[in-house]
Amino acid sequence: MKKLFSMLLLVCIVIPLQIQAISMEAIKNDKNNVPILTGKNAITYFVDKSSIKRVEENEFIYKAQAVVYEVENNNSRRTNSYIHKVLVTYRYDINHSVASVLRTPQYAQDYSLLIYAKQASSGMKLTINSVEDFNYEGVALGNFGNIPEQYVDVALHDPKYVVGNYIFKEAYGTT
């Protein structure tokens, strides 16, 4: 009886862990996961289209949230490839859009100044809400939740800017 109870308890603990685990195969086979920046990059980003949602918007600020899988590729420097399942919130200040910046007379006359202005501040910020780590087979390695909201700037040349643009396009229909 004690053995049966122990087995039942073990099954109750192991089955939920397996349901939440995500493997590389599962990510690639799910049609909701859209690959962003594949190729020679050390990390491929997959955005779960079904998780994209508008969080908040006002006249100048837009926020969108989504699950992004950061998958380390074989050409990475690390020995063990990993998968991060990251819940992110992007914040975009519309005052930093190209159209808004062009309304400023100094930038409308000299496009090189416009480029410098966009490089200085893309208008996009990012915060990480939670992270779950897995190996390629789907074995859970760690879980970090309830991360305090702390936005960091996303530069134009950062791959996360491309990911953020995709999320905003899906959430709001524009980039």
Where are these regions (language model features)?
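A structural signal for short, hydrophobic beta-strand segments that form beta-sheets
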Residues: 46-49, 103-105, 118-121, 126-133
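Detector for glycine-centered tight turns/loop "hinges" at secondary-structure junctions
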Residues: 42, 111, 123-124, 136-138
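C-terminal partner/receptor-binding element of secreted or periplasmic proteins
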Residues: 133-175
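Mature extracytoplasmic domains of secretory-pathway proteins
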Residues: 56-123
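N-terminal secretory signal peptides
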Residues: 21-83
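Sec-dependent N-terminal signal peptides
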Residues: 4-16
